Amino acid sequence: MTAAHKVKITYCAECGYEPQTLDLAKALMLEFGARLSSIELIPWEGGTFEVSVDGQLIHSMKRDGGFGDSAAIKDAVRTRLAG
């Protein structure tokens, strides 16, 4: 099975969000590894922390508040991968 799903995590580098970003990336790799073709980490600014799958935003710090629960983000990724 060829994985075609791409996850993108855009985070505020100037805010020091690297630990949360790396923790989430690791959790997603452990949970979905072979089902993903890539997990792209994009340093940004302005308090940004966003997670998208195949271009669809599934979590935004500004929209949803905070970093989000990793279990909830994994559920959203799972839903997106399912269909």
Language-model region placement:
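Structural micro-motif
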Residues: 44-50
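Non-catalytic, surface beta->alpha helical segment in thiol-disulfide oxidoreductase systems
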Residues: 58-82
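Short strand-loop junctions, especially beta-strand C-caps/beta-turns
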Residues: 10-14, 56, 61-63
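Generic domain-boundary/flexible-linker signal
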Residues: 18-20, 50, 62
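Short, thiol/selenol-centered motifs that function as redox-active sites or metal-ligating centers
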Residues: 2-28, 32, 45, 81
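A short linear hydrophobic-aromatic micro-motif
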Residues: 36-40
